[in-house]
C-alpha cells in the first residue's frame, strides 16, 4: 500500500481482522504473527516511509537466552543468568510473572527472527562486551525494519504510512476502530505498539518538573504517547513507574530529537565523571558497562542543570568507541576544565584526590571486573581506576538521553490491556514500549527492549488474530 497522509484515503474493504498501531519492531512482529492466523492485517504507521520504525531504527542487538555458543555468540547465556541480570538492574522486574515469561520465551526469538528474514553478524568488539549475551543483526535497526516490511509485503500485510491514530472508538469493553484525521479504520482486534511518551516534554514535566526541558530524546518526536493517553482515557490500567525510563549519557551537543545510538558516550568507565561543580557523584566502575550504562541517564538527570562531564586521558582514548563529536582536548586538567566551562580549581582538586586514592598493585583489564579500585574516597571507583595523568586530556559535556519511558498499560499474560476495574479489554492488545513497565522498573539491560517487543509482539499478534477469528 502506498503512503497516506493528511487528506489521503484510508484503506477500505470493510473491517480489518487485526489493525496494528505502530510500525516499529513490536508492531511489525505483531502483524507478522497475526497474519499466520488472520486474513486481513493492517499496520498503521505514523511516520512516512523513509522515517518509519520509531526507536527500532536506532537499535542493533537483542538479548536472549541461549544454551551454547554459536557463530553469532561467544558463549552460553542460560535462563537463570538472564533472570539474575534482569533482577539485578534497578529495582528488578515490574511484574515477575510477565518478566519470567519474557525471559523464557526469549530463547525462541532468534530462530523466529531468522525465519522472517533477519540476518545476523559475528559479535562486535567494543565497550559493551555483549558478544556472549546478545546477538547483533546485520545492518542495524533500519535494516531490521526494512527486512520485516519486505516479509510483511510477501505475506500480504497492508501498511499505511503518515497516519496518526488520535483515539480508539470504543463500545463497552471492545474497540470497534481507530480514529484518525482521515477517518475511521474499522478492526475486529487492535494491537497498540505505538511506543512511550518520551518525546512529550509536557508529559515528562509532570514527573520531572523543569528538569525535563534539559533532556534529549534519542528517538523520533512522534513518540508523544497519544495512543497511551487514549487508552488511559478509556479506562486502561497503568503499569510502570511514572519517573521510569531507559536513558543513557549522550553528548550534550546532540540534537533534541532522534539522535539515536550514535550520540551515546562509552567513555565513562575509563575515566571520571564530574558535575557542574567539578565534583564526582557516582562510581564510574561499579559494574560491567552493559549492566550500568543505562543508569547514567538518570544519574545525570539528578545533577544540577542535568549536565555532567566525562573526563579521561590519552592512555585510555582507544579503549572505547569514539564519540560522534570531537571531545574537548587540552594539555592540562585546568585547561580542559576551562574548555568545558567548569571550575578549574574544583576539577583539578577532584582529579588530584582521585589519583591519590587509587590502590597500588592492581592489574588493569577493561574486559572484566578488574582489581583496579580506589580507597578512602566517596564515591569510590570499584574497577578500572587508573590515574588521570597522561596528556592530552579529553572531556565531553553530557546530558540525559531518553530512549523510552516505562509508564504504560498493564497487560495480561495474553497481552490484553487491563482496565482499572480489574477486567481486560476484550480485543485490545499491547506490545513493546507501551507495556514495558510490566517488565522493567528503573533499570535496563542492553538489548532487552527489543526482546520485550519481540516476545510480546508475537503474543499480542497471535492473540489478536485468535480473538478476531473467534469473535
Spans of model-derived segments:
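Conserved N-terminal/central alpha/beta ligand/cofactor-binding core
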Residues: 5-7, 40, 46-158, 271-280, ...
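Beta1/beta-strand and adjacent pyrophosphate-binding region of the FAD-binding site
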Residues: 10-26
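Core beta-strand elements of the Rossmann-like FAD/NAD(P) dinucleotide-binding domain
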Residues: 14-16, 181-189, 424
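Helical element adjacent to the flavin cofactor pocket in flavoenzyme catalytic cores
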Residues: 139-182, 188
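Glycine-rich loop(s) and the adjacent beta-strand/alpha-helix scaffold that form part
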Residues: 184-251, 459
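An anion/pyrophosphate-binding glycine-rich loop and adjacent beta-alpha core
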Residues: 224, 228-346
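Helix-rich C-terminal "cap"/substrate-channel and partner-interaction subdomain
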Residues: 299-392, 463, 467
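A glycine-rich dinucleotide-binding beta-alpha-beta segment and adjacent secondary-structure elements
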Residues: 348-438, 442
